[in-house]
């Protein structure tokens, strides 16, 4: 069953402050001001609805959308209707849209982006008044905290919402406020509901591994941390965030989720439960490996202090203590379930593994800058990307479609795309290949290609590989559950991947984002035996780790709660891994457990607001570029190289600290000023500060290794960086022409230079606002920049008028009709220009021009005339205006008109014997009924 997204309000705290924290608004007004967002459903939203007695029948909602679609279809054929009929249809459409809005809108749940601590304190102390109702803080999940966002709820129901979502936990059990925030916030995770499974909770399993590390000891204040290589013995939780699910329960959930396959892994959510379930034949294991015994220990104890036993024949899900965050706040599973039932809390699945993995992995600069690559390696790595972009051409329509719409298409998929409510200009291209002559469509394709090239300069190139779920050996897991000493099916240096085994690949490079240090590339030797094929047979996808190494430490402290791992078999990348690099380790601070108060919660919020992870990642990129520059000039055996290298390790530690910042509820060390701030040294300063000769020497040294310059390729990441670079080059270009009467490029390429020219170039590079060396990413960037993809000649932006007859209706409009369309479209163009950026990946601003479109149609009284007015507005009278608005407003009706002229389309489909080559696969053009 499809579930539409829920509409909620979202404000910036500065807006609330401007109006004295009191705002009165309607849904339509809030939507026009971009203060309405759409969120996937969650337990928190379901609880609020239940308290309010509001039930959303999502099947009924689909009927509403179908009814609205029916009215749209009638309007699309309104050339044959009377003016009165059109007005009735428009009115009915407005009424059903209002019903949809009313059904999906939840005014009790509002998100606020906190822009100052004073705003936060005011909202927590006094609340905000929205439409006459008082709202106070309800929650702040870890993800929301990183974006300085809180959820507020109306005072009318907030106490009951908290009481239900607290789910009867034992409040006398000490708990860190920051942890509680994160656990309580899990109820706002987007989930699809599934039936309650029969489950047990088991203890986690830990063992140790001894290995050598770069150990970081934090030094307070404006100083580098101490980094020393030493051997350590570290305990690892092999079941961290992971549980098991039987194939029969996995099949049941798959059916409930509307899937035609059994996912190898499911994400899991329930009150204070979070993690991943791996599909594994737990009952078969008990029968064959555990000697037919199904009796196992659970985590709970009876009154005599003995572990309560469970018969696994009666259960289908095994949950670890690390998944059940507050297991010790309940007497047992029955107590927990009783509370779940009383509070009407449902089991949910946020995500699940796909039926098939992709065959192409998009790399990124973090993955690439941490490799040992030379110029030839860069060319080889970029070859598939260059060939991919070079293949896009006006003359190769089939390739163009694959570039625009992707691969793995089916007839059903093409039809679903044609019926969907977005990308209408692309639909027009599919319906009629002649639309490739449209200047607007060509400009869209040109922009897309240019964007792909720019992203390529940033490291977004393609290699064989994909992302898969990280899994801890489920065979060893079941051994642990059954009380058998875990040996697993994988040795200390073994890993498993069905995907790669099917392709005969025995070694891959594993990478987990965000990737900061070289050791986070792990060469994985893949194992395949009759035993692995039998017991891992439900893991069609997923990367299985052994229970004996320290791989999770290399992967930045990964766990198994649905973390994903990138793997590639690309030989250049595998060769480029620093195979003997040590991983980073530090003593991470632990949060204080206590009976927390509201004040503790507020402190935890404030500590967790904002994130400087991006800044730390940038500093590591700066350091990699600087390290390459130092190597080129001075080699590795010098203090400059050693300190810069040490800072890369410290960046890794700082990033880990920032990720855990919200969990521990206190500030962590970030980037020392010593790394980025230039310290002036003149005679007066030296005298006034009393600097010794050694002090001056040290200051000069640290000034020489500042991480204050972005690498060259970052000009494609930040517009400001590009502007500074371009301005600097222009100034020096002019100076070069004035001084030497030649271009800068010519001067650089001169074999023999005068002392003055050498000095000019030395200064040019010294004061360059970016680091210009041969680091892997800088080389890659310059290589792609140097290729002439001939976009202008392949995708020319010719005159568009020839395509207008392809999209117009057979209808004549009047001047009065045009003026109606002109007025409304002009308003929509202003609104489109002012669209804000309030959202993140999990939410989207609700922008809907359909009511404006219907208004034009109803006032003109004819869809054909209305569409033709709009087409002429953009193509005849205002050709420079943004045609995105034309397709947003009238795309549905243009496509309906085009579909009447064609019953089939031709589309490139996967075909092993096909004659169309694209990204290493073959396709053939096939007829598709629409």
Residue ranges and their predicted role:
Residues 569-595:
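Compositionally biased, low-complexity linear motifs
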């Amino acid at each position: 069953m499809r579930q539409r997204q829920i509409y909620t309000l979202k404000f910036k705290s500065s807006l609330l402050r401007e109006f004295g924290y009191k705002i009165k608004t309607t849904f339509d007004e809030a939507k026009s001001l971009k203060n309405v967002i759409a969120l996937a459903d969650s337990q928190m939203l379901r609880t609020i609805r239940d308290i309010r007695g509001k039930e959303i029948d999502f099947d009924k909602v689909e009927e509403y959308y179908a009814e609205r679609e029916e009215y749209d279809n009638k309007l699309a054929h309104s050339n044959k209707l009377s003016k009165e009929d059109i007005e009735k249809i428009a009115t009915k459409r407005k009424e059903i849209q209002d019903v949809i809005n009313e059904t999906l809108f939840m005014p009790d749940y509002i998100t606020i982006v906190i822009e100052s601590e004073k705003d936060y304190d005011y909202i927590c102390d006094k609340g905000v008044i929205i439409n006459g109702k008082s709202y106070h803080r309800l929650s702040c999940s870890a993800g929301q905290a990183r974006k300085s966002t809180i959820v507020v709820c109306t005072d009318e129901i907030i106490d009951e919402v908290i009481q239900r979502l607290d789910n009867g936990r034992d409040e006398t059990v000490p708990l860190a406020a920051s942890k509680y925030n994160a656990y309580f916030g899990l109820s706002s995770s987007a989930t699809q509901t599934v039936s309650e499974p029969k489950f047990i909770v088991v203890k986690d399993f830990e063992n140790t591994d001894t290995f050598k590390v770069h150990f970081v000891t934090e030094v307070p204040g404006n100083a580098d941390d101490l980094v020393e290589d030493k051997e350590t013995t570290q305990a690892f939780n092999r079941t961290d965030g992971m549980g098991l699910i039987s194939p029969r329960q996995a099949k049941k959930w798959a059916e409930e989720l509307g899937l035609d396959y059994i996912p190898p892994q499911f994400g899991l959510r329930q009150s204070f439960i979070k993690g991943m379930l791996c599909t594994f034949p737990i009952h078969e294991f008990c029968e064959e490996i555990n000697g037919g015994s199904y009796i196992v220990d659970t985590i709970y104890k009876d009154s005599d202090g003995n572990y309560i036993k469970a018969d696994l024949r009666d259960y289908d899900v095994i949950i670890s203590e690390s998944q059940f965050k507050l297991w010790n706040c309940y007497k047992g599973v029955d107590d927990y379930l009783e509370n779940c039932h009383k509070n009407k809390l449902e089991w949910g699945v946020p995500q699940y593994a796909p039926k098939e993995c992709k065959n192409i992995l998009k790399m990124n600069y973090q993955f690439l800058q941490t490799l040992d690559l030379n110029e030839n390696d860069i060319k080889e790595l970029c070859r598939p990307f260059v060939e991919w972009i070079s293949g896009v051409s006006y003359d190769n329509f089939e390739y163009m479609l694959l570039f625009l719409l992707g691969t793995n298409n089916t007839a059903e998929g093409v039809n679903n795309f044609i019926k969907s409510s977005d990308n209408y200009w692309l639909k027009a291209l599919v319906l009629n290949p002649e639309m490739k002559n449209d200047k607007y469509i060509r400009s869209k394709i040109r922009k897309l290609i240019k964007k792909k090239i720019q992203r390529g300069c940033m490291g977004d190139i393609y290699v064989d590989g994909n992302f898969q779920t990280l899994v801890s050996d489920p065979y060893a897991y079941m051994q642990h559950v059954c009380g058998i000493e875990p040996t697993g099916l994988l040795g200390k240096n073994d890993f498993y991947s069905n995907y790669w085994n099917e392709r005969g690949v025995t070694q891959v490079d594993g990478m987990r984002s965000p990737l900061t240090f070289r050791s986070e590339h792990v060469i994985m030797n893949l194992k395949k035996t009759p035993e692995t094929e039998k017991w891992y047979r439900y893991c069609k996808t997923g990367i299985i780790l052994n229970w004996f190494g320290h791989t999770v430490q290399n992967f930045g402290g990964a766990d198994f709660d649905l973390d994903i791992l990138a793997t590639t078999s690309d030989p250049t990348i595998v060769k480029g891994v620093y195979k003997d690099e040590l991983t980073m380790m530090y003593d991470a601070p632990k949060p204080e457990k206590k009976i927390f108060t509201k004040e503790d919660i507020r402190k935890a919020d404030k500590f967790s607001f904002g994130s400087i992870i991006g800044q730390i990642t940038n500093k590591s990129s700066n350091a990699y570029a600087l390290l390459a520059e130092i190597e080129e000039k001075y080699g590795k055996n010098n203090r400059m190289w050693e300190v810069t290298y040490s800072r890369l390790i410290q960046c890794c530690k700082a990033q880990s600290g920032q990720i855990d910042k919200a969990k521990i509820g206190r500030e962590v060390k970030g980037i020392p000023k010593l790394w980025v701030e230039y310290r002036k040294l003149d005679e007066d300063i030296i005298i006034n500060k009393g600097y010794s000769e050694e002090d001056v020497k040290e200051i000069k040294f640290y000034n020489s290794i500042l991480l204050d310059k972005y690498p060259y390729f970052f000009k494609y990441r930040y517009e400001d960086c590009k502007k500074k670079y371009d301005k600097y080059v222009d100034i020096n270009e002019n100076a070069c022409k004035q001084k030497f009467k030649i271009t800068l490029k010519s001067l650089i390429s001169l074999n023999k230079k005068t002392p003055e020219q050498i000095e000019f170039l030395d200064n040019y590079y010294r004061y360059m606002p970016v680091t210009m060396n041969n680091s892997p990413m800088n080389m890659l960037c310059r290589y792609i920049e140097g290729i002439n993809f001939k976009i202008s000649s392949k995708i020319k932006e010719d005159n568009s008028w020839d395509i207008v007859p392809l999209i117009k209706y057979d209808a004549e409009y009047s001047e009065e009709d045009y003026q109606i369309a002109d007025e409304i479209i002009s308003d929509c163009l202003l609104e489109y220009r002012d669209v804000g950026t309030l959202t993140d990946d999990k939410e989207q601003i609700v922008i809907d021009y359909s009511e404006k479109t219907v208004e034009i149609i109803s006032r003109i009284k004819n869809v054909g005339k209305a569409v033709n007015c709009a087409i002429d507005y953009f193509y005849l009278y205002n050709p420079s205006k943004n045609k995105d608005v034309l397709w947003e407003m009238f795309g549905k009706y243009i496509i309906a008109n085009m579909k009447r002229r064609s019953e089939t389309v031709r589309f490139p489909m996967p075909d092993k014997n096909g004659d169309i080559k694209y990204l290493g696969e073959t396709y053939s053009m096939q007829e598709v009924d629409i």
